[in-house]
Design a protein with these regions (language model features):
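Transmembrane-helix signature of polytopic, membrane-embedded enzymes
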Residues: 148-175, 191-192, 211-213
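Interfacial juxtamembrane loops and adjacent helix segments
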Residues: 55-120, 127-128, 288-331
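Membrane-interface alpha helices of multi-pass inner-membrane proteins
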Residues: 50, 167-172, 212-232, 240-247, ...
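Membrane-lumen/periplasm interface segments of specific transmembrane helices
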Residues: 255-361, 378-391, 444-452
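Hydrophobic, aromatic-rich transmembrane alpha-helices
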Residues: 243-247, 340, 348-374, 381, ...
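Perimembrane helix-loop-helix junctions
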Residues: 199-208, 237-272, 360-373
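Signature aromatic-anchored transmembrane alpha helix within multi-pass, membrane-resident enzymes
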Residues: 9-20, 215, 219-223, 240, ...
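Transmembrane-helix motifs of polytopic, lipid-linked glycan transferases
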Residues: 135-159, 196-200
Length: 628
């Protein structure tokens, strides 16, 4: 029987080996800076740290690190987070509080330290040492190979190989995961930590006779989650709770307590390592800056000092209190729940659809939904999501523009372990179909999707989903060039525009053109609330334009070369110190300027030119009423 069972798994095993070999060969054969289109998001910090660990055996940033980085990328480490070090001394006293931590500035002014978690860079360093930047991609391939093997082994213990392989591949291929696979950042590292940890913890629940059905596997899982907590505190720290609570529900009090202690000790050890290197336990705390354009040590005469370079950034410890005590919390939370689930850029349904299938299959299973370990796993994932929305209401997706929810991505693999036992391949096929509707274009070329994330939402089903207005300034369109995001409207400094597609253009001296080719979505970000907009519109051709500002659409027929004036009611969302509205425009007809005037070399498909003025509630109350 053992031989027959092994033969059943031979096909998936061979396929997995082929995929890992092919992906590994690709990782080692590309020109990393060119193929990945240069730097993205927070890559510069992690890459520079990995290079420093690999070639210098330290985690300090000095002039030689800048020279090495510039030699590889032919540019500086744009967006790198660095901090000045501290010399820390721990003093023990005979009176409370007994222990005192004393810090003073690092006397060596020729070195700085990295302002991000260093675990990923440390583990990736051996691969970088032997394979250069390609080693980072190879590291990701091997991590994904381990994750895929754990996912398949867990599922195959409850279902036939074909069904297990279909679901496992859907979880990895029909989600946003392939894009994060080419980001030179810790996302795949954190993903694998959670996958392996939960496999070690839960495999004994589905295969009680296996060699992994031992108490040490739970402790090993706690070690990994402790490491993950250091690397990504939220949501990983929340994922430790089910390990402790499951033991306590079974009256294994000491085992649960020790599991929690191990996770805390491991996380504390890595924060301690951070303190030993830089003098700060918090890698995001202290005297920390980010750098663009010019960098420390980039002048040979020593003039490129810390004080003359970069802009300060801090972790605001007061933010959680302010967020939780705000009177706007209920309304903001309700909007964020909607965006978290079905948001156009970061939504759970479009970018983690296999997880939706896993939850649905679990809830529909009369037996699996009563399993305490599945209930605890779902509870932890749910709690992590709620925590992100409440504590990080403006940046719960991770910021920086990557597609999908970068923070929740760490918790995503835990959803795999909700999948109930069964024999059908239908859930896996459904996961592939539903996920592919939104992520197929990401899978075709993840390098393009990673560098230009705003392109993936300009066409396809994602265009039907709501825009995350609470995080207008963190949307991928901020990365678009030529500039389409954070564009000032004409001469009004209180109004900024974010053109989410290529069916409208930034304002020109005479107004803003919308396309004749289709609907355009534009975020209007204002420093004040808007009651309605006063519009003027004109076009050289007859057309019908439809305009909405988060409320009732207004349709206006334009006659050639005649200006139409009208008002559009507004309804928006309160953002981070601003008010955000989604302006939707569409023109029924279009024209090409060159074909009307041959001397005009403008080949755009234009529909109408708009000018608008926002009207505040105070102005409206003074007698400027909306038209009936």
């Amino acid at each position: 029987m053992t031989t027959a069972r092994t033969a059943n798994h031979l096909g998936p095993a061979v396929l997995a080996c082929v995929l890992v070999v092919v992906a590994g060969a690709l990782a080692l054969s590309i020109d990393v800076p060119r193929t990945t289109y240069g730097l993205k998001s927070d890559e510069s910090t992690y890459v520079a740290a990995a290079l420093s660990a690999a070639y210098d055996g330290d985690l300090a940033f000095e002039r030689k690190d800048l020279e090495r980085f510039a030699g590889l990328y032919h540019s500086g480490p744009e967006g790198i987070f660095l901090k000045r070090g501290k010399v820390m001394r721990i003093r023990v006293r005979g009176e409370f509080p007994f222990v005192r931590i004393v810090k003073r500035d690092d006397p060596d002014r020729t070195r700085l330290y990295f302002g991000k978690a260093i675990a990923y860079s440390i583990f990736a360093a051996p691969f970088v040492r032997f394979f250069g930047l390609n080693g980072l991609l190879l590291f990701h391939v091997l991590l994904l190979g381990v994750s895929g093997s754990c996912a398949y082994a867990f599922l195959a213990a409850q279902r036939p190989p074909a069904s297990a392989a279909t679901i496992a591949t859907a979880f990895m291929g029909a989600s946003v995961l392939p894009v994060y696979g080419v980001f030179l950042m810790p996302e795949i590292f954190n993903f694998t930590i959670v996958t392996v940890a939960y496999f070690l913890w839960l495999y004994k629940e589905v295969a009680p006779q296996s060699r992994l059905a031992r108490p040490w596997t739970t402790i090993a899982a706690a070690v990994l989650l402790g490491l993950g907590t250091y690397s990504k505190p939220l949501p990983t720290a929340v994922l430790v709770a089910p390990l402790v609570l499951l033991a306590w529900t079974r009256r294994r009090w000491m085992q649960g307590f020790m599991t929690g202690v191990v996770a805390v000790v491991v996380a504390g050890a890595f924060f301690g390592l951070n303190a030993a290197i830089s003098g700060e336990f918090n890698y995001q705390g202290g005297d920390r800056k980010t750098f663009y354009g010019s960098f420390p040590f980039d002048a040979p005469d020593g003039s490129a000092t810390w004080e003359r370079r970069g802009g300060s950034v801090t972790t605001d410890a007061s933010t959680p209190q302010e967020v939780l005590s705000s009177s706007e919390l209920p309304a903001r939370f309700a909007h964020n729940v909607e965006y978290f689930l079905v948001g156009r850029h970061f939504g759970f349904v479009p970018y983690f659809f296999p997880g939706v299938v896993a939850i649905a299959a679990w809830l529909l299973s009369s037996t699996a939904r009563r399993d305490s370990w599945r209930l605890l796993t779902f509870g932890a994932i749910f709690s992590a999501a709620i925590g992100l929305l409440i504590l990080l209401p403006w940046t719960w997706s991770g910021g920086g523009g990557p597609p999908g929810n970068r923070y929740f991505f760490t918790a995503y693999p835990a959803l795999l372990f909700l999948v109930p036992p069964g024999i059908s391949v239908a859930p896996g096929i459904l996961a592939w179909i539903g996920g592919a509707l939104f992520t197929a274009k990401l899978l075709v070329n993840p390098f393009v999707a990673a560098k230009f994330p705003y392109l993936s939402v300009e066409k396809g089903p994602a265009r039907r989903l709501p825009v995350e207005l609470t995080m207008a300034n963190d949307l991928p369109v901020r990365l678009a060039q030529p500039l389409r995001g954070h564009v000032q409207y004409r001469t009004d400094p209180g109004v900024l525009l974010y053109h989410l597609d290529q069916n409208s253009w930034p304002p020109e001296p005479n107004g803003m053109w919308i396309s004749g080719a289709g609907r355009s979505d534009i975020i209007v970000r204002a420093a004040f609330p808007i009651q309605y907009m006063q519009f003027e519109a004109e076009s050289p051709v007859s057309t019908v334009i439809t305009i909405a500002l988060g409320s009732t659409p207004v349709r206006v027929t334009l006659e050639p070369r005649k200006t139409a004036s009208f008002n559009v009611p507004a309804s928006g969302v309160r953002g981070f110190g601003d008010y955000n509205y989604l302006l939707t425009t569409q023109s029924s007809e279009g024209f090409v300027p060159h074909l009307l005037e041959p001397a005009n070399m403008d080949y755009r498909n234009l529909g109408a030119q708009l000018r608008f003025r926002p009207v505040t509630p105070a102005e409206a109350s003074e007698g400027k009423a909306l038209p009936k």
